[in-house]
Curated annotation (Swiss-Prot):
Keywords: Cell membrane, Membrane, Phosphate transport, Symport, Transmembrane, Transmembrane helix, Transport. It comes from Buchnera aphidicola subsp. Baizongia pistaciae (strain Bp). This is Low-affinity inorganic phosphate transporter. The chain crosses the membrane at residues 4-26, 56-78, 98-117, 124-146, 156-178, 207-224, 234-253, 342-359, 379-401, 473-495. It is found in: Cell membrane. It is a multi-pass membrane protein. Low-affinity inorganic phosphate transporter. The keyword ATP-binding does not apply.
Amino acid sequence: MSYYFSFFCYNSSVVFSCFSLLFIFIYEVINGFHDSANAIALIIYTRSMNEKMAILISGILNFLGVFFGGLSIAYAIIYLLPSNLLLNINTSCGLKAIFSILLSAILWNLCTWYLSLPTSSSHTLIGSIIGINFVNAFINNFSILSLISFNKIIYVFLSLILSPICGLIIAGSLVFLLKKYYNSKYKEYCINISPVYYRIQKKKQSLLWIKITLILSSFGISYFHGANDGQKGIGLIMLVLICIFPSKYLINLNTSTYDIINTRISIDSFEKYYLRNQTLIKQNVSNIMFKEIIQPLLFLKNIDNTKNDNVLVIINFMRNLLHNISSYKELNVIQCHQLRQSLLCIGNFMEVLSHFSIVQVKDKHFFYCLKKNLLSTIEYAPNWVVTFIALSLSIGTIIGWRRITNTFQNKLGTQDITYAQAISAQLTTACSVSLASCSGIPVSTTHIMSSSLVGTMLVNRSGLRINTIKKTIIIWILTIPISMLLASFLYWISLKCFN
């Protein structure tokens, strides 16, 4: 026993990293449990593809989606964390916050999966992050308004809430058009009958184009689900690595000399803009806002928290830090931490400026390009992290698909799903998730698919199983509040019990 205790004491980083990877692995596997049904339920139901083949291909496409999907959504979720916690993420508080987020998300997702109820991993994750925001504000005596970026949260909330509504309307409209068009002109096609009826009647019409459409849209859902949901896991694992191994992961040590030069050029460009518009900026940015942005950078000797010209001090500090640097490996851990904080603060300042009405559209685009160049140093993920998340999501897709698939196939409506309904729901989901992934917008694949199916049933007058719909809506409504409470409770307990 003493051996294990001493091993834990001297190798705590290794132990924590193993636990963190295990938690994230479980989270992504459960995510695969839930969302695999979105892609394969209808192609299995319509017998467009063999069950085992559909599951295998869905898992592979989820993997590829994570690997080639980029990182915009990963960091959109990360930046919902409190700014003071994000800037000092490599602390024990940061690690406790991440564990609380993961554990609350795992518990809720596992419960809903066991009950065969489709819920959103994105909603769970965002609810958990908001819970951390509230506890962080309370224990530090901060105003919650100063810690939460409401513009970002409203933006994410709107995408999560409006996407199912759009799915319902678009899928319903598609069914209406297919029903009207094919019933009047092409009655010989069997698009408006169910696969069950097709088999009973022993119809001989070709289903080739229907099956091809269903298979391709299913592949699209699988790929873009990986691109959208997989990124959230990548963001979480990067936060864990920064907490446990700051010397290796605070910034991208493998950044090329070319990219470092681009960062220096971006800093110089922002300084020129700031000097040209310094008076106008000071008139519109309040002292309180300046203090909130500069507060984490009090390690700089020339910072005066009572003045409004500290932005130039930060710019000069970053310029001096990057002077004659050809590789970030030349910086020590403290310098890496200071560079990360400085880049985040300048990025936040650009975000603040871009929301002012006085800023022209061309200047907003200028800020967007500058911010992208500056944050490329810290918005990254090693290939092994992406591979780990991709494998986790794929494994979840392959082993846990049956429960939620059964809900989609049999429990939403009182009548069998027609080919037209299946095509409409899958095309709507595939297009919505692909558009969101390419735009860097986090959405819930589960919610879009569920609402699309409900929309087709309403238009087709298939009849809905009210109990299942009621349970699903209740789960949707409760997901964010419950995950908030769970994460808040776990974070509070961890802060009080494990100092």
